């Protein structure tokens, strides 16, 4: 279990078992209390490994904190972006699965980031991260012949 008071330690570099969906929810809940705005979270991993599930729990936890009704959170595969406006925070959820070239990313204004937003990006492989700050990488992985799932956390850079 990742405890709230351990979150900054977990952010540095750790691998967490999320085989049980409840563990994914707990991790997302902890992240919701850690993130303040301005962060960019890159979500890596195969289809179905838990990226969107993590995002759903994270956004719903932000909504609970702000006492906003929970909304359905789906992957923005076709429209590329779903935005969730909370009281003082905007969560931008991108899914870049369909993009094939780095040039397509420039039109999305992904990095028009501010301290009032948290940006979540699924399938970020085409992004050049060199000049970005406040990034967190979440790498979701199947293990033991697809029976288990883990997430490796790396950041803040």
Locate each region found by the language model:
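N-terminal pre-Walker A segment at the start of P-loop NTPase domains
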Residues: 8-28
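P-loop (Walker A) phosphate-binding loop of NTP-binding proteins
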Residues: 46
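AAA+/P-loop NTPase substrate/partner-engagement loops
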Residues: 73-91
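Hydrophobic anchor at the beta1->P-loop junction of P-loop NTPases
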Residues: 41-43
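Short phosphate-coordinating micro-motif centered on Lys-Gly-acidic
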Residues: 101-105, 111-157
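Conserved lysine of the Walker
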Residues: 51
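Post-Walker A helix-loop "phosphate-sensing" segment adjacent to the P-loop in P-loop NTPases
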Residues: 60-72
